[in-house]
């Protein structure tokens, strides 16, 4: 029996996050677009308000918590793949590292890359929490 590691994340303190970094909110990987830190009072601990946008769904999410609280950060694996076929709303890719076949829905393709998808082209793919996103055509 082969066990597969599904969630590839690590934990960091909320105060260490910066704009442009990534965080998992409600099970969805998100890119931090705004972070605000404020000290509540003389005896209160500092709080962080994090605004992030979902990598896959584009949804805006807000998270408020103490700066010393642990937050889940996704480990993003970046690799090159070759397009085997583009059929309807699914792109079939071949991972150039181990030559396995991957299917990526068209909704997980960056807008600027959509017009340049053609069989044989090489693309940069990000694997985040066991899902794939095509970032750009090389």
Swiss-Prot record:
Please provide, in alphabetical order, the Gene Ontology terms of the cellular component aspect for this entry: cytoplasm
The secretion signal range is: none
Q: Which GO terms describe its biological process?
A: positive regulation of translational elongation; positive regulation of translational termination; translational elongation
- Enumerate the Pfam families for this protein: eIF-5a (PF01287), IF5A-like_N (PF21485)
List of residues that carry Hypusine: 42
Coiled-coil intervals, chain numbering: none
Q: Does the keyword Transcription regulation apply?
A: no
Q: What is its main location?
A: cytoplasm
GO-annotated molecular function: ribosome binding; RNA binding; translation elongation factor activity; translation initiation factor activity
The listed locations are: Cytoplasm
Q: Which UniProt keywords apply?
A: Cytoplasm, Hypusine, Initiation factor, Protein biosynthesis
Matches recorded under InterPro entries: IF5A-like (IPR001884), IF5A-like_N (IPR048670), NA-bd_OB-fold (IPR012340), Rib_uL2_dom2 (IPR014722), Trans_elong_IF5A_hypusine_site (IPR019769), Transl_elong_IF5A_arc (IPR022847), Transl_elong_IF5A_C (IPR020189), Translation_prot_SH3-like_sf (IPR008991)
Cross-referenced PANTHER family: TRANSLATION INITIATION FACTOR 5A FAMILY MEMBER (PTHR11673)
Q: What does this protein do?
A: Functions by promoting the formation of the first peptide bond.
To which protein family does this belong?
A: Belongs to the eIF-5A family.
Name-wise, this protein is Translation initiation factor 5A
Origin species, per record, is: Pyrobaculum aerophilum (strain ATCC 51768 / DSM 7523 / JCM 9630 / CIP 104966 / NBRC 100827 / IM2)
Q: What gene is it encoded by? A: eif5a
């Amino acid at each position: 029996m082969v066990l597969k590691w599904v969630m590839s994340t690590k934990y960091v303190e909320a105060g260490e996050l910066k704009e442009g970094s990534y965080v998992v909110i409600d099970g969805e990987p998100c890119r931090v677009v705004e972070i605000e830190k404020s000290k509540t009072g003389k005896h209160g601990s500092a709080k962080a308000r994090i605004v992030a946008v979902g990598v896959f769904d584009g949804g805006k999410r807000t998270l408020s918590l103490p700066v010393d609280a642990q937050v889940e950060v996704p480990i993003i694996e970046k690799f090159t793949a070759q397009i085997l076929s583009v059929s309807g709303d699914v792109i079939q890719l071949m991972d150039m590292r181990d030559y396995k076949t991957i299917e990526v829905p068209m909704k997980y393709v960056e807008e600027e890359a959509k017009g340049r998808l053609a069989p044989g082209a090489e693309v940069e793919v990000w694997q985040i929490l066991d899902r794939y996103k095509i970032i750009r055509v090389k």
